[in-house]
Swiss-Prot record:
Cytoplasmic side: 1-82, 129-142, 188-215
Primary gene name: SFT2D3
Protein name as annotated: Vesicle transport protein SFT2C
One term under GO cellular component: membrane
Protein species of origin: Homo sapiens
Membrane topology listed for this record: Multi-pass membrane protein
GO BP annotation list: protein transport; vesicle-mediated transport
Length: 215
């Protein structure tokens, strides 16, 4: 802006070279803003920071990417494999409590829930951060049985670790099993409702044949 003002003054001075009066400036000189006029911006500049709204979209996207940890494929596979091994260990320890399930119901449910949580974490790590990011951004809607299973899993862990209640832990484990069965039935090609009607129909026909046939 200062260069344009100077060039305009030189052009007017050349046009009125023979006049007694000097050319008056048409534009007022704008005072350049010095860095020290704004203490907050000066301090942020020394710290290497900028206001979020002062960044361009490209800079905001780059800043968002740098905030994410850089994990290689090998590290993700190692972490996922470790979670799956710990899940297998928890499932194995839970199987040891199966003969005394009535006496150690809370420990069995706790180990089973920890194994399920570790298995889910390992599967998420092996699946990759992009797929998990799509779920967190609600770009992929999870199914209702999956949400119910996650809620039952969290409730079981809270009842076992926080409340230390055997009854609530057993109820949470039962809710886990029901949600898991609903999720597995929902994965069938013909749908959960059709599969349930088919199973009930077969059970009804089997009961009718048992009544008709002689023993």
């Amino acid at each position: 802006m200062a260069d344009l003002h100077r060039q305009l003054q030189e052009y007017l001075a050349q046009g009125k070279a023979g006049g007694p009066a000097a050319a008056e400036p048409l534009l007022a000189a704008e005072k350049a803003e010095e860095p020290g006029d704004r203490p907050a911006e000066e301090w942020l500049g020394r710290a290497g920071l900028r206001w979020t709204w002062a960044r361009s979209p490209a800079e905001s996207a780059a800043a968002g990417l740098t905030c994410l940890p850089s994990v290689t494929r090998g590290q993700r596979l190692a972490a996922g494999g470790g979670c799956l091994l710990l899940a297998a260990l928890c499932f194995g320890l839970a199987a040891l409590y199966a003969p005394v399930l009535l006496l150690r119901a809370r420990k069995f449910a706790l180990l089973w829930s920890l194994g399920s949580a570790l298995a889910l974490a390992g599967s998420a790590l092996l699946r990759g951060g992009a797929a998990c990011g799509r779920l967190l951004r609600c770009e992929e809607a999870p199914s209702r049985p999956a949400l119910l299973y996650m809620a039952a899993l969290g409730a079981t862990l809270f009842a076992a670790l926080g409340l230390r209640s055997t009854l609530l832990t057993v109820l949470g484990a039962g809710a886990q099993v029901a949600a898991l069965l609903a999720a597995l039935v929902g994965l069938l090609p013909w749908g959960g409702g059709t599969a349930l009607r088919l199973a009930l129909g077969r059970l009804g026909r089997g009961a009718g044949l048992a009544k008709v046939l002689p023993v």
